[in-house]
Amino acid sequence: MNLSMRWLDEFVHVDTPIHDFCEALTMSGSKVEGYEVEGTEIENVVVGKVLAIERHPDSDHMWICQVDVGKSEPVQIVTGAQNVHVGDLVPAALHKSHLPGGVTITKGKLRGVESNGMLCSLKELGLTTHDFPYAIEDGIFILQEACAVGEDIRTAIGLNDTVVEFEITSNRPDCLSIIGLARETAATYRLPLHLHTPVVQGAGGDVNDLLKVRVENTELCQRYMAAVVRNIKVASSPRWLRERLRACGVRPINNIVDITNYVMLEYGQPMHAFDLKYVKDGQIVVRNAAAGETITTLDGTVRELSPEMLVIADAEKPSAVAGVMGGEYSGIHEDTDTIVFESACFKGSSVRLTAKKLGMRTESSGRFEKGLDPMNCEGALLRALELVEQLGAGEVVSGVIDIDHADHTLRRVPFDADWMNRFLGISLTREEMVESLRPLEIAVVGNECIVPSYRADLEQKADIAEEVARMYGYDKIPTTALRGSAEAIVTPEQDFERRINNAMIAMGYDEIVTYSFMSPKMYDKICLPADHPMRRSVVITNPLGEDTSIMRTTGLPSMLDTLARNYNNRNPEAWLYEISSEYLPREGEDLPEEKAVLMVGCYGGEADFFTLKGTVESLLSRLNLPRADYTAVSTHPSYHPGRYAVLTVGDVEIGSVGEVHPTVLENFGIGCRAWVARLDIALLFAVRLPEATYHALPRFPASTRDLAVICDESLPVAAIEKTITGAVGNILEQIKLFDVYRGAPVPAGKKSVAYSLVLRAADRTLTVEECDKAIEKALKALSQYGITLRA
């Protein structure tokens, strides 16, 4: 929020250096970001009047001007500008003058003709057409103000103000106004506050004969006020008003629009003006938008509305998006004759959601969404009407329409002086506290504080204590050391993720971090069918672009995209992992399910299915998880048929591992085979075993037997291992696959699978007969699959 010190002086007079002012306001809770004293870089530049012009004898594009600068004799200035005419008032930089950017002007000769200064453009004065819309970008700045010849240009065009920039927190919307900051200034310096009560004469008639207002949603619109002005004269605003708007960073447009902006800055109450002839049947309806309804806003954009949005409509269609922006159709035009001024109080959360969904944030919405005071509507509307009469911009029709459903009861907050002293660590009497609250217009009655309507942030004792502290002075509160300690606690789930990280790094993998946003086209790249459930994604309302328009439901595209980047940067091999989140929409819920997963990907070097499978098994072992079973699946569209398996522990499917489908690899531009594993971290945590227990080293020797069998090509080795383990029983210490062979003399459609079995008993040395019997049990159990011993 920019504050013009000249504007502030209208409400409270502060006679103190600007640096001290900024320090005092900051220490009282209104943080100052900085300040700018206008015109400090401009020196010895005055208003000049062009008396005569003649062409330069040695140039076809330069002119010799005789300029009256308020001295006894005119000065001669040579210029190359083509827009200067006799009688023009212009900024004249005289000999030894200074301009922004460290430029110094001295007299000299231009192609043999003496020039005693320079006629200045906007740019040379450090200004733009934003400051003076009537001026041109290229050429001399021709003044349209009523200026005195020889007057300092800074005074002539209003560059003699000091502008202070405040950082206003979201809980103080009242300070997004000149009056709000004037209240803070008066309270800080204990000075009287001079608030002006608007006076409107009126030109007769009755507003109710011209306009009808109906509020259908009183929850979202607590108060709606309207007034009518007829016979308006759209023109440029007077200089003083334009200077104040410019100082606060608002571009002057015309008197009607400028009045609404002026009142918004002065009162903090957004205003809007409608052209009455475009309000059908003279009827304004405050209602929710209809499904599929659209409006073309003042910026020329067609916007689609939804039923939760509040609009200001006439008898047929919306005229404005409540609290955000007006409609182009009903805006002020050159032929506008009668207007409606609107001053309303809309629910902050509704305005915020509407502005966010439409992707447009305005000065108006920024104020409404913080929550405004319904009691401020009347003063702001009357001030706008007063300015209309003051500027001669139109005739105010008598009366105003006021649809008021707001609760005007002032909030009462408990007041406890002893509690506040303990809370703040100070020692003030009750009377001193009451006295410190009085400049803030907070009245103490008994054990309660009566809070002004514009201070919606004061809700409890701690809030009142803060007001006492800032009026007492934060710098006066003694510094005390903090007592007590807080210890950070790592949850079991967080520790589990740390162990996963450590295990993956120990196995030589590099961690990656990717965005949770992605493009819908990624689903096409991983070959998901159009009706696949994983395509149901959370859609971002206002994305940065299509590439970040949805939340991912699978971490596979992010992993493959990173593998592709490594491959395209000629990295011969990549071993990557990521602990990421997948976002799954939930029926009837606003927020999605956020699922933590471990994605592991690799290509090149020794990467293959069994290497990645070994990584997964090693990880499960390090995490003290049960051994997982692998079940081949050939239907996943993103993986190679027959080279993809899901992992289960008991009945719980904890993840998958597989080779990426060649088509998917081609879509990502990966020119080699790649493998990806996915593990659900929450399920891993759920199936983990109790803390590991340790046993003494075995006292008896082990016996190793190799077992080679012939089975169907389609039979998973996991089924063989599970059968052997169950048949041999607890004397089987370890089973390890060491060979898979296809080809002669093994029959076609068959494969040879060889295991190494380590047998050991805890209480004795196994005999040869016991070992042979164990192998026989295994073969008998395997026979159910048609498995035979390889000769």
PLM features per residue range, with description:
Residues S4-M5, E23, W63, Y189, ...:
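Glycine/proline-enriched, intrinsically flexible loops and inter-domain linkers
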Residues G39-E43, V200-A203, V263, S485-T491, ...:
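Beta-rich nucleic-acid/ligand-interaction surfaces
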Residues G180, V413-P572, R705, V758-A762, ...:
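Extended, well-folded interaction surfaces typified by the phenylalanyl-tRNA synthetase beta subunit core
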